[in-house]
Amino acid sequence: MSEIRNVYYPQSEMNTVLLPVSNGCPYNQCAFCSMYKDEKYQEVPLQEIEQELMNGDPYTERVFLTGADPLAVGYERMLRILKLIKKYFPYCGCVAAYASVRSLKRYSVGELAALHREGLRLLYVGFETGNDEVLAFMKKGNTAEEAIQQGRKLTEANMIFNAIIMYGIAGKDKCVENAKRTAKMLNQLKPRKIITMNLTVFQGTELASLVKEGKFAEAGVKEKIREIKSLIENLDVEKRVEFDTTHATNLVKLQGWLPEQREEFIEKLED
């Protein structure tokens, strides 16, 4: 059996059935990330996935595929996994997973649409920022324009996706400008939900070394809150989008809908 050391999932999926698809991260180069630094990437054998499903509750209605980037397994393998879920969990109405801009580039619109038809209905995509300089500094492996292109592919394939954004990622004195660039990206992406996280410098990461060397200065609490406020102010929402800052790393807790709660959120951030 494959050894799955660390399992991460969005807090909104805490009551969802978890299905291991991979262990570790196939990229594992983001400067700020400590989640899979000491883990070798491996894909869970299909036989083990099928056994897990056979032992599960056939009345399961929702599944979350675990692993840093399950779509990195490729189209054919993902299609087989979804067909197995449909076989053993016939009442499952939604399969969700994390995804990266890098892995999405491997898929055509037609392939994404086919995965959607087989039950993959929701992706949590770590966009982090719309600032190309920051993306390069943090070694995300993509540009803002590439992120927008992949978001458009998802929309064309009828795939719902949530955008994960990280404030404080640009560093001291750069937060407001970062918010404006990120809002510009989000305005084109049009995700169903925007989930924010606060940059945390974890020991053992490349970012921790950069801080120690004086090559990255962390933003203070007040500046980070200004970044959240600026992000909300610059979001030009054509359709309703959920805005959620309730992840454990966040400095403030906001949850609701834009544009109707924009002023309410801004007032809370100004208190």
Annotate each predicted stretch with a short phrase.
Residues 3-48:
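Canonical Radical SAM [4Fe-4S] cluster-binding loop centered on the CxxxCxxC motif
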Residues 25, 33, 49, 65, ...:
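Conserved, mostly hydrophobic/aromatic
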Residues 38, 68-70, 98-102, 128-132, ...:
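Active-site beta-loop-alpha junctions enriched in small/polar residues
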Residues 41-44, 48, 73, 77, ...:
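Alpha-helix N-cap and loop-to-helix initiation/capping positions
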Residues 45-61:
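Short microdomains enriched in Cys/His and/or Lys/Arg
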Residues 56-157:
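Conserved SAM/AdoMet-binding glycine-rich loop
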Residues 65, 122, 145-207, 221-245:
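Conserved C-terminal portion of the radical SAM core fold
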Residues 207-271:
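C-terminal accessory regions of radical SAM enzymes
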